[in-house]
């Protein structure tokens, strides 16, 4: 089920290249550690293979359908505990923390120079103990609703979304990662709990640490937070829908009060096979080679004020 499991060979090669230690706990959680002598800080990231495109799955035989923006909304809610906001706990230790959601993953991270064990407990504890109520969800719906409206005022963000809506006719990628005000209004506590049961299982997650820390220290943190032992797993089945449809639109236009026109070009490629790192890197390079700042196309577009 896990994308991370499918990428184990790539992880092993990458880990060896950077001198990274790795282990898989009996619970299924993958722990990566890059001990860096001479460094005074520690960076940690706790990630799950759950992003905005994961909208349909079955949990213990029951189908679950999620509205757009669920993964991003859940990211916000995971940072809230009955005892308060996790970022306030980080502030007391002097750590810098953040979280983000992409199309295929959600990540929680911190960097710190002191109280590393305490910060690891905050990180693993908040993600491992979800807490949702109707009242807290309603409050967050208002907050994220304002965030969505703020991004609607960003020309670059709207341009990116317009490109995706041209590329995809009926695929979750065409929807904004944050969803819409209307879509997140559909969320309930049970929907979010279903997501944590399905995607926040240790076997679908990775803890990666680097800096002034050892692998044993990271594993001990997992033990303290109940992430070491094997546990009964929910039966989960999910798949990202295939997209074999032609382009939804060849072009799109919108108007906004901007100082200069915004212009974007997108090319629809075949889906990447999980673990095909070589092709992924080649596609990343292709953008620079075709429309990068040193290309003739870029200069021609620049000269025509595009």
PLM regions: where:
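Short, intrinsically disordered, charge-balanced linker/junction segments flanking boundaries
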Residues: 303-306
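Acidic/histidine-enriched segments that form metal/cofactor-coordinating
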Residues: 3, 82-195, 216, 243
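His/Glu-rich zincin catalytic helix
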Residues: 1-86, 193-300
């Amino acid at each position: 089920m896990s994308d991370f499991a499918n990428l184990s060979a790539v992880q092993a090669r990458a880990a060896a290249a950077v001198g990274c230690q790795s282990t898989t706990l009996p619970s299924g959680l993958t722990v990566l550690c890059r001990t860096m002598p001479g460094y005074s800080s520690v960076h940690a990231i706790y990630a799950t293979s759950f992003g905005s495109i994961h909208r349909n799955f079955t949990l213990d035989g029951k189908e679950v359908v999620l509205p757009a923006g669920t993964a991003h909304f859940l990211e916000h809610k995971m940072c809230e505990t009955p005892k308060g906001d996790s970022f306030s706990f980080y502030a007391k230790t002097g750590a810098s923390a953040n979280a983000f959601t992409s199309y295929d993953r959600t990540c929680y991270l911190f960097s710190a120079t002191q109280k590393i064990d305490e910060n690891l407990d905050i990180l693993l504890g908040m993600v491992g103990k979800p807490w949702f109520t109707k009242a807290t969800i309603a409050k967050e719906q208002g907050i994220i609703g304002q965030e969505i409206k703020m991004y609607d005022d960003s020309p670059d963000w709207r341009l990116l979304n317009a490109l995706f809506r041209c590329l995809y006719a009926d695929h979750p990628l065409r929807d904004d990662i944050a969803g819409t005000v209307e879509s997140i209004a559909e969320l309930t506590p049970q929907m979010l709990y279903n997501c944590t049961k399905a995607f926040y299982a240790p076997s679908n997650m990775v803890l990666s640490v680097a800096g002034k820390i050892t692998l044993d220290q990271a594993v001990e943190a997992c033990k303290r937070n109940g992430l070491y032992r094997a546990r009964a797993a929910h039966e989960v089945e999910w798949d990202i829908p295939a997209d074999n449809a032609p382009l939804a639109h060849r072009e799109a236009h919108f108007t906004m009060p901007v100082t200069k026109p915004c212009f974007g070009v997108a090319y629809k490629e075949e889906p990447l096979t999980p673990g095909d790192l070589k092709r992924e890197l080649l596609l990343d390079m292709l953008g620079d080679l075709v429309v990068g700042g040193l290309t003739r196309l870029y200069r021609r577009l620049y000269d025509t004020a595009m």
